[in-house]
């Protein structure tokens, strides 16, 4: 069966004019008759590209301030007509076939993101005719070609040039999928926006904004299929959120190494998000989504060396993240010292790349620099539902903490407390972190009782010969009993940072005073499950 369809007439109507002139010129060069609307038609005419206004083609003017332009039988009949079936109906109604439609939609997302956007502004940027044409063309992909993204202009022209002015069914079907994805995302954004409008009274349109819509719509695009999931019997794929513009594992470029696994991606995300918390040279080593070593240094090499010393055993087969360009010295130290699954950094020097290339299986990622963090949502799937929350971007500075003990922390201890608190945010609850001089010396993660996390952190430090005496400790949540304080004191901890908020806070503070320890409250918890 012949699956190519010639393009003799095209309708172009775009809000984003990127590349449209070149596309229209190429279509004209192929002998395609061009129809267009409003601003797009004017742009083409101003550049001497022959074009017919849709209103002239239909014999009906745009009405209602442009709200009704393309909603006409001559447009949708021309798009939806089945070639070889509907010709008689088309002739009876003076309808000509439209073989290609190029549409991108009113900028709804950009409009509602602007400060001071009103509901009226949002409403006027809800496209009606555009999505209708997109869906009509995509539905009739057997005969018509839909283009919703400027990146596909060149592809369509190249195929027409290779097929005597025609497109193939394979291409039309692929473009139809992209079109339905496009309209689904567009409608989802509109539904989310309106869904956050909470009526103050039953007869009101809207008054109050809710953070979370009545129904939640989000679209993720598949980046790659994965060999398997968390375990080898599970199928998996990696999807990315194209609305997020931030340095991340999702946007990172893989420079070398084996394909990333499901667990690689999850662990790399944990490592990268943790290292983003620090300004000076820093290194984070993660194993099973928990930091097993975090450190600051005068340079990356020192930061890596100190992070590795926290727990060399757990660092084996781990993920290493840096917050500055990976240099040759640090790369050589990693290659000489340990087996590593993934290394990620904002940038990797050519010299470092050459060194790591000797370990062909090591996955080396470059994620780009980061300046700000995007305000996004976190999702957690439960059986039959989805938990959604704000991303945990809670920050605590020195001026935010409250000293609750008799003993005052020193300036150096306060620096270590801030460092330790940042690390604890990325450790699975119950989380306890011991640190000294900008270096973790023990991490207790994921225990069902807080006291055992405290004990494990001490055991880890002792196993590596790290001195706990006069170190500081961070706890991601309050201490329900004094036993965690007693365990920390026995290990040699001299200062503690924790949220506070327990009904036994007075008893906890008294325990710290009894041991001669300094203690500060943050008033903020960092549970991580």
Curated annotation (Swiss-Prot):
GO terms for biological process: 'de novo' IMP biosynthetic process. The lineage of its organism: Bacteria, Pseudomonadati, Pseudomonadota, Gammaproteobacteria, Alteromonadales. Residues 1-148 form the MGS-like domain. Keywords: Hydrolase, Multifunctional enzyme, Purine biosynthesis, Transferase. It comes from Shewanella frigidimarina (strain NCIMB 400). The gene is purH. GO terms for molecular function: IMP cyclohydrolase activity; phosphoribosylaminoimidazolecarboxamide formyltransferase activity. GO terms for cellular component: cytosol. The keyword Ubl conjugation does not apply. Pathway: Purine metabolism; IMP biosynthesis via de novo pathway; 5-formamido-1-(5-phospho-D-ribosyl)imidazole-4-carboxamide from 5-amino-1-(5-phospho-D-ribosyl)imidazole-4-carboxamide (10-formyl THF route): step 1/1; Purine metabolism; IMP biosynthesis via de novo pathway; IMP from 5-formamido-1-(5-phospho-D-ribosyl)imidazole-4-carboxamide: step 1/1. This is Bifunctional purine biosynthesis protein PurH. The IMP cyclohydrolase activity resides in the N-terminal region. Its EC number is 2.1.2.3, 3.5.4.10. It comes from the Bacteria. PROSITE patterns: MGS. It catalyses: (6R)-10-formyltetrahydrofolate + 5-amino-1-(5-phospho-beta-D-ribosyl)imidazole-4-carboxamide = 5-formamido-1-(5-phospho-D-ribosyl)imidazole-4-carboxamide + (6S)-5,6,7,8-tetrahydrofolate; IMP + H2O = 5-formamido-1-(5-phospho-D-ribosyl)imidazole-4-carboxamide. Coiled coil: none annotated. InterPro entries: AICAR_Tfase_dup_dom_sf, Cytidine_deaminase-like, MGS-like_dom, MGS-like_dom_sf, PurH-like. SMART domains: AICARFT_IMPCHas, MGS.
């Amino acid at each position: 069966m012949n699956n190519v369809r010639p393009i003799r007439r095209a309708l172009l109507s775009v809000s984003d004019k990127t590349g449209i002139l070149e596309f229209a010129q190429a279509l004209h060069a192929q002998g395609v008759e061009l129809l267009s609307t409003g601003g797009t038609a004017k742009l083409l005419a101003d550049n001497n590209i022959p074009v017919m206004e849709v209103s002239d083609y239909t014999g009906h003017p745009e009405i209602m301030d442009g709200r009704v332009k393309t909603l006409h039988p001559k447009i949708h009949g021309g798009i939806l007509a089945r070639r070889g079936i509907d010709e008689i109906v088309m002739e009876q109604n003076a309808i000509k076939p439209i073989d290609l439609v190029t549409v991108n939609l009113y900028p709804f997302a950009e409009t509602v993101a602007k400060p001071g956007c009103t509901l009226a502004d949002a409403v006027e940027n809800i496209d009606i005719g555009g999505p209708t044409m997109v869906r009509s063309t995509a539905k009739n992909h057997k005969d018509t070609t839909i283009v919703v993204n400027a990146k596909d202009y060149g592809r369509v022209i190249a195929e027409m040039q290779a097929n005597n002015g025609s497109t193939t069914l394979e291409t039309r079907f692929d473009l139809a999928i992209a079109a339905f994805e496009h309209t689904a995302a567009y409608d989802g954004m509109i539904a989310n926006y309106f869904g956050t409008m909470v009526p103050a009274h039953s007869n009101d349109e809207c008054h109050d904004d809710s953070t979370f819509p009545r129904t939640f719509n989000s679209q993720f695009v598949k980046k790659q299929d994965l060999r398997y999931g968390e375990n080898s019997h599970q199928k998996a794929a990696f999807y990315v959120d194209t609305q997020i513009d931030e340095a991340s594992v999702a946007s990172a470029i893989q420079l070398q190494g084996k394909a990333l696994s499901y667990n690689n991606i999850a662990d790399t995300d944990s490592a990268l998000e943790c290292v983003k918390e620090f300004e000076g040279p820093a290194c984070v080593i993660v194993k099973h989504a928990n930091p097993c070593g975090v450190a600051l240094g005068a340079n990356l090499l020192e930061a890596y060396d100190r992070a590795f010393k926290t727990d060399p055993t757990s660092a084996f087969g781990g993920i290493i993240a840096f917050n500055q360009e990976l240099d040759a010295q640090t790369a050589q130290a990693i290659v000489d010292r340990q087996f590593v699954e993934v290394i990620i950094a904002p940038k990797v020097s050519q010299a470092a790349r050459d060194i790591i290339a000797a370990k062909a299986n090591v996955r080396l990622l470059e994620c780009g620099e980061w300046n700000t963090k995007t305000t996004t949502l976190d999702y957690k799937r439960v059986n039959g539902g989805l938990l959604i929350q704000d991303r945990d971007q809670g920050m605590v500075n020195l001026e935010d903490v409250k000293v609750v003990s008799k003993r005052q922390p020193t300036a150096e201890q306060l620096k270590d407390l801030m460092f330790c608190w940042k690390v604890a945010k990325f450790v699975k609850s119950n989380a306890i972190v011991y640190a000294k001089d900008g270096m973790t010396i023990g991490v207790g993660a994921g225990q069902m009782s807080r006291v055992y996390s405290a004990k494990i952190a001490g055991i880890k430090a002792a196993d590596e010969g790290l001195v706990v005496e006069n170190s500081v400790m961070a706890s991601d949540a309050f201490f329900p009993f004094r036993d965690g304080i007693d365990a920390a004191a026995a290990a040699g901890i001299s200062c503690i940072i924790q949220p506070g908020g327990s009904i036994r806070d007075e008893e906890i503070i008294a325990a710290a005073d009894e041991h001669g320890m300094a203690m500060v409250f943050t008033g903020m918890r960092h549970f991580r499950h």
